[in-house]
Amino acid sequence: MSFKVAIPARYASTRLPGKPLLMLGGKPMIQHVHERALACGAEEVVIATDDTRISDVAEGFGARVVLTDAHHESGSDRIAEVATELGWRDDDIVVNLQGDEPLTPPDILHQVAEALERHTDAAMATLCTPIETVEQMLDPNVVKVVRDAADYALYFSRAPIPWDRNVGRDVTHRSLEGCHRHIGLYAYRVGFLKAFAAMSPCALELTERLEQLRALHAGARIQCPVASQVPGQGVDVSSDVERVEKLLRA
């Protein structure tokens, strides 16, 4: 199958400024992410950034880079600009690989693109993995997803969904069967991506700070199978850097 990968990379991260250029194992993080994308079989890999410090480094290791507007609200909006700039067709499939995920298995990039290609009624595809601990279930930084019988997403939330009415607030004794954590990896058809970027954020998106709720609110279907491999540790805060370096060396 044919698909593209776009890697949105911002310099002005609130919690970790300059994050894409952090050195991990002798290479900037964005280079590790780019190498994962190249290994997945995509026909085209592009880094989308609003900062020349990132573009200069990326072009230095041979990446294709598109400089974008600095005022996009999300990575999806940034990739929509790239799709327009490069003249991608509306039926092209593009995978959004975040620039702070240097341990993403290449196989799941192919998996999410293939899931979208197979489900022609879906506007987007993403992935999930089973939740393994109550701590994950309660962590608002772990986004939960509930799905229907055909693996289409019904809702995403930072809250512990589905809520187990039988145990109420005594969540330490709840069953985690059927509970899933969302992986922030997306595939879109370019035509829908452009329409998505033109939509105003909905109240649910603004409340949860989850852009995929904009798509659900608009009536779009999101296919969400279980990932074939568990994704690696991302880099959100400075304490993640040492852990990721150890995993890269393993």
Curated annotation (Swiss-Prot):
<dbReference type="GO" id="GO:0005829">
    <property type="term" value="C:cytosol"/>
</dbReference>
<dbReference type="InterPro" id="IPR004528">
    <property type="entry name" value="KdsB"/>
</dbReference>
<keyword id="KW-0448">Lipopolysaccharide biosynthesis</keyword>
<keyword id="KW-0548">Nucleotidyltransferase</keyword>
<dbReference type="InterPro" id="IPR029044">
    <property type="entry name" value="Nucleotide-diphossugar_trans"/>
</dbReference>
<dbReference type="InterPro" id="IPR003329">
    <property type="entry name" value="Cytidylyl_trans"/>
</dbReference>
<comment type="similarity">
    <text>Belongs to the KdsB family.</text>
</comment>
<dbReference type="GO" id="GO:0033468">
    <property type="term" value="P:CMP-keto-3-deoxy-D-manno-octulosonic acid biosynthetic process"/>
</dbReference>
<keyword id="KW-0963">Cytoplasm</keyword>
<dbReference type="GO" id="GO:0008690">
    <property type="term" value="F:3-deoxy-manno-octulosonate cytidylyltransferase activity"/>
</dbReference>
<comment type="pathway">
    <text>Nucleotide-sugar biosynthesis; CMP-3-deoxy-D-manno-octulosonate biosynthesis; CMP-3-deoxy-D-manno-octulosonate from 3-deoxy-D-manno-octulosonate and CTP: step 1/1.</text>
</comment>
<dbReference type="GO" id="GO:0009103">
    <property type="term" value="P:lipopolysaccharide biosynthetic process"/>
</dbReference>
<comment type="function">
    <text>Activates KDO (a required 8-carbon sugar) for incorporation into bacterial lipopolysaccharide in Gram-negative bacteria.</text>
</comment>
<dbReference type="Pfam" id="PF02348">
    <property type="entry name" value="CTP_transf_3"/>
</dbReference>
<comment type="pathway">
    <text>Bacterial outer membrane biogenesis; lipopolysaccharide biosynthesis.</text>
</comment>
<keyword id="KW-0808">Transferase</keyword>
<protein>
    <recommendedName>
        <fullName>3-deoxy-manno-octulosonate cytidylyltransferase</fullName>
        <ecNumber>2.7.7.38</ecNumber>
    </recommendedName>
</protein>
